[in-house]
Amino acid sequence: MITQKEKEHLAKDKQNIYLRIISGIALVSLFVIAILCLKTLFYILMILVGLGMLSEWYNMTYPSINYLLIGLIIIPIPISLLIFLSMEESNRLVIMLYFCILWSVDTFAMIGGKTFKGIKLAPKISPKKTWTGLITGTVSAGLVSVLVSLIPNYHIEHYYFSNKIYLFIISCILALIAQSSDLFISYFKRKFNIKDSGHIIPGHGGVLDRFDSIILTAPVFFCINIYL
């Protein structure tokens, strides 16, 4: 027999999922338009994301100067690298692919974790994450990136992103790094006894909650584009 409290909890979870889906679709649509059509809008969005992440980091770590300084290093760098890459018109599609990888790993890791349950990945840092979620998210990100690359006229000049085998491998690596980045930020949130960094994005929490994966993935993505 389900208690009234459990019913309320289930109803709240259901409402949260709907909010997450609606706000997620809106956010993804905005970024797709910005990346593919309006370069200036992408710059503005990334700057706003960076400022939002810095603001939430400040609220989370204040008054610790050492941790504040960490935020001033780990947040502006990936934001700047993505903006720098987007300045080159030929990088437009590969940046779109990068965000598709991040969105798919986040989505399918959550679906895989909720569906298959299994052993906890890092129970002390992020209790809801599981190894099955990690594997599901990683493989799905690789498959999604390959499917996106099959879209007619979706031609990427970079060899390692245009080759389907290399693309799958790179996507899986970026997916693993994305989840490591998520755990990295979760460590700081647990340290300061914070569940969500904010509430500005309905169903997702704060800007830092939504975009934490770029912190470690953007530098790797940048190096792949520039040096390989």
From Swiss-Prot:
GO terms for molecular function: phosphatidate cytidylyltransferase activity. The chain crosses the membrane at residues 31-51, 65-85, 93-113, 131-151, 165-185, 206-226. InterPro entries: PC_trans (IPR000374). It is an enzyme of class 2 (transferase). It is a multi-pass membrane protein. Pathway: Phospholipid metabolism; CDP-diacylglycerol biosynthesis; CDP-diacylglycerol from sn-glycerol 3-phosphate: step 3/3. Disulfide bonds: none annotated. Its EC number is 2.7.7.41. It catalyses: a 1,2-diacyl-sn-glycero-3-phosphate + CTP + H(+) = a CDP-1,2-diacyl-sn-glycerol + diphosphate. Its main location: membrane. This is Phosphatidate cytidylyltransferase. The gene is cdsA.
